[in-house]
């Protein structure tokens, strides 16, 4: 073995290792279908969660009703399991959840005090605002076409 063969091998291994660092890549993008535990005041406002909408279950079946007052109709198709679980460690006098997506989406939230549905809070984007009790909330994001998946961000903010 020549004197130069060993150092070249180390250099190649170091270059390959430096080019592939899954930890660094994982930190740059927010996880899809992430859950959150938050307290008042929010430490990061807005808090952003990402996901893919849709599924095969009608929103009215997830919600157990066709509409919730005053937030709106329980439309769209969703997965059986919630897309996100958000735990509030304290009461929020005002909290806003708004979905942003390139296409029309729907939302269902189940938690302390009931179930809320929404379709077109901000244009074609669903959202729910108001007073929120401490506890665990399950959140579903739906699509109008069965089994259609659409990328979205869920923004959680105390800002009006």
Predicted regions and their residues:
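Hydrophobic beta-strand segments within beta-rich accessory/binding domains
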Residues: 84-101, 107, 137-141
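Intrinsically disordered, low-complexity, charge-dense segments enriched in Lys/Arg
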Residues: 27-30, 156-160
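Predominantly extracellular/luminal regions of secreted and cell-surface proteins
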Residues: 27-66
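Noncatalytic accessory or regulatory domains flanking protease catalytic cores in secreted, cell-surface
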Residues: 108-155
């Amino acid at each position: 073995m020549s004197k130069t063969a060993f150092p070249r091998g180390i250099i190649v291994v170091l270059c390959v290792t430096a080019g592939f660092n899954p930890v660094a890549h994982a930190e740059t993008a927010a996880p899809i279908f992430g859950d959150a535990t938050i307290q008042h005041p929010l430490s990061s406002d807005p808090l952003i969660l990402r996901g893919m909408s849709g599924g095969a279950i009608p929103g009215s079946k997830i919600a157990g009703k066709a509409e919730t007052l005053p937030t709106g109709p329980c439309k769209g198709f969703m997965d059986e399991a919630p897309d996100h679980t958000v735990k509030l460690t304290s009461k929020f006098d005002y909290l806003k959840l708004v979905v942003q997506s390139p296409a029309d989406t729907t939302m269902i939230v189940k938690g302390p005090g009931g179930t809320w549905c929404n379709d077109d809070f901000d244009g074609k984007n669903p959202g729910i605002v108001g007073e929120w009790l401490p506890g665990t909330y399950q959140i579903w994001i739906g699509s109008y076409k069965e089994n259609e998946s659409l990328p979205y961000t869920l923004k959680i903010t105390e800002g009006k």
